[in-house]
């Protein structure tokens, strides 16, 4: 079974995981009501997408 030959330092461990960070989601203002929404999604507050009313689907 493989065994580490040397201790992995904190800085080396941190460098390896540096790209695993969370990114801040992109937010844009809704053209209808001005609330912040993610792009290409229906607005939760007014229900519009590209200035068109999206019908509510009941599940």
Curated annotation (Swiss-Prot):
| Keyword Aminoacyl-tRNA synthetase attributed | no
> Taxonomic lineage per UniProt?
Bacteria, Bacillati, Mycoplasmatota, Mycoplasmoidales, Mycoplasmoidaceae
Protein's GO biological process: translation
User: This protein is called what?
Assistant: Large ribosomal subunit protein bL32
Query: To which species is this protein native?
Result: Malacoplasma penetrans (strain HF-2) (Mycoplasma penetrans)
Question: What's one Pfam family here?
Answer: Ribosomal_L32p
Recorded hits in InterPro entries, A to Z, give: Ribosomal_bL32, Ribosomal_bL32_bact, Ribosomal_zn-bd
Record keyword Ribosomal protein present: yes
> GO: which molecular function terms?
structural constituent of ribosome
Q: What SUPFAM superfamilies would the database entry show?
A: Zn-binding ribosomal proteins (SSF57829)
Q: Which UniProt keywords apply?
A: Ribonucleoprotein, Ribosomal protein
- A GO CC term? large ribosomal subunit
Family to which this protein belongs: Belongs to the bacterial ribosomal protein bL32 family.
Domain of life per record? Bacteria
């Amino acid at each position: 079974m493989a065994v580490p030959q040397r201790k992995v330092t904190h800085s080396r461990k941190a460098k390896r995981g540096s790209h695993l960070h969370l990114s801040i989601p992109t937010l844009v203002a809704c053209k209808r009501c001005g609330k912040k929404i993610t792009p290409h999604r229906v607005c939760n507050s007014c229900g519009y997408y590209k200035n068109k009313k999206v019908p509510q689907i009941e599940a």
